[in-house]
Amino acid sequence: MPEFLPISKKDMDARGWTQCDFVYIIGDAYVDHPSFGHAIISRVLEDAGYKVGILSQPDWRDPASVTALGEPRLGFLVSGGNMDSMVNHYSVSKKHRQTDAFTPGGVMGKRPDYAVTVYCNLIRRTYKKTPIIIGGIEASLRRLAHYDYWSDKLKRSILLDAQADLLLYGMGERSIVEVADALNDGMDIHDVTYIDGTVFRVREPDPNLPCLRLPDYASLAADPRKYAESFYLQYCNTDPFSARRLLEPYGEHEFVVQNPPQKPLSQEEMDRVYGLPYCRTYHPSYEKQGGVPAISEVRFSLASNRGCFGACSFCALTFHQGRIIQTRSHESLLAEAEAMTHEKDFKGYIHDVGGPTANFRQPACKKQLTKGACPNRQCLFPEPCKNMIADHSDYVALLRKLRNLPGVKKVFIRSGIRFDYLLADRSETFFRELVRYHISGQLKVAPEHVSDHVLEKMGKPCHAVYLRFLEKYKKINEQEHMKQFVVPYLMSSHPGCTLRDAVTLAEYLRDTGHEPEQVQDFYPTPSTLSTVMYYTGLDPRTMEKVYVPKNPHEKAMQRALMQYRNPANYALVKEALVKAGRTDLIGFTPQCLIRPYPPKAPRRDAEKSEKQPAASQKPSQKGAAQPPRAAAPKKPRGRR
């Protein structure tokens, strides 16, 4: 039975340790499961022979909290957690969230805002010279100058604000071991400048080190156009085979240097990483607090792949995991699934077999294996590349094996499915088996919008592709004698989306009968194309101007249009229709969205009847219909 890594001096004593090689400070609760970045990095280091202690959610108001495990021999590792701490804390309207799924008991407030920076500064108050190495999603996506939505300003590289010595971006398994080995061999942390997948800072750039020089921070902060240009240079240098080393100046005597990304892991390396001895659950010290809610989403799920060549503008995966797909072998996944079947809480259902995009189980084309992804072209956008190989045969074979495992009743796919890639496959085998075996009544996909010029800014396929998918989905369901639904994820207020576009989306919802219970407003998170559009008003790919809905009232109108049937939204919907010049949608005909006057408030007895339906009543089917109509979505899990 695997043991958790030490979280206290007592645990260290039990192992006979007097000092950790690394103390890993994390913003999440300690969950030893490969869906949590800190679990993978700590187990990879342990596998390489290093002693790692875990310091989870230390009290940032108390400098002594980071000393609980003593000074590490080689350095501190710092991660904000599985999410950027600001996304974790705040909704898109900048309101404080009430719960934190990555904290024991779901309690909010156990980590600071800008957690990586705060933790590092806390360490520096006590340990002046001990190396600090930062990583994880927060550090990775803030590695160079970036727009910060919450402060509404362009921030410097997190490496500078955190006073850290080295930043590891991307997934980090290979680079962390290389860094550890260098430090273990006696190398000074400031000399560790040669490892791919790292970012470091220097007083003077090495004239013998070829770099692509980005605009300096002062000019970026002064001119949004410069920032858009700089970001696109970064965007075109994310492939490990072709990326150049990037240099970002901060004044005359401070520079941040980003080395090219790490090469993708081989299948053997992926298998080894996921085959390490994880406890696969949260630390037992959290039991009295109710455990860690986030484990419920992944405990009986399988991570099949990494990377994504989908190119959604609002997604940062290209910056973090890259575009080249990396997969685990069937044997590795079957072994993990078989082990799941012996867990006492396993009920026979594998919740997911996927990754960033479930149906990407191979590189987009053969060229990517040796030359990487094209720096100036996308695989699926604006339409599938002629060199792309759309093939689900390996995924189909894997799913069949999983379905046949003793103790497995059903295998679900809950990661995002790219419907354009699905349609590009000439074989219908996967589509048919997806419908027959792997959906629990509804399939969640992410068309995001219906206006083609908005979809172009999003990096998504045109609306006609989604309609073709719906027709095929409906046809296969009918052939299989099944009645399953589609849940479309839709987004309001994305750059490029005007009020008229929002009205067009509302008309589509009217025509399909879909009534979304949840509406996702565009969230400008660090290091996405869409965020750069939001900040600069420019599309970095073309440098053309983009309309950006920033006014809170307009954003509220766009959201209200997606839920125009809600009486509480009547005033906003009417105002939006008038401003968009669409008063033809106010009236009594079937195509109208609202009546000329607001709806009457429901009577109290009617409200009571709605809240407490009679036992003989059937469950409401509001929002659910046969394809191409869609069911009202449950809590979103991801967008592809």
List each language-model region with its residue ranges.
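N-terminal [4Fe-4S]-dependent radical SAM core
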Residues: 1-19, 29, 225, 229-301
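Flexible, glycine-rich loop/tail regions that form catalytic "lids" or insertion modules at the edges
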Residues: 22-26, 67-68, 192-198, 287-288, ...
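Conserved SAM/AdoMet-binding glycine-rich loop
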Residues: 24, 55, 59-60, 339-487, ...
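N-terminal pre-triad scaffold of radical SAM enzymes
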Residues: 25-30, 289-316, 349
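Glycine-rich beta-alpha loop elements in corrinoid/cobalamin-binding modules
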Residues: 37, 56-251, 258-259
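Terminal amphipathic helices with adjacent charged low-complexity linkers/tails
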Residues: 61, 190-239, 252-253, 262-265, ...
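Flexible glycine/acidic-rich beta-alpha junction loops that bind and position SAM and/or redox cofactors
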Residues: 84-93, 141-143, 173-178, 202-205, ...
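Conserved, mostly hydrophobic/aromatic
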Residues: 165, 273, 308, 333, ...
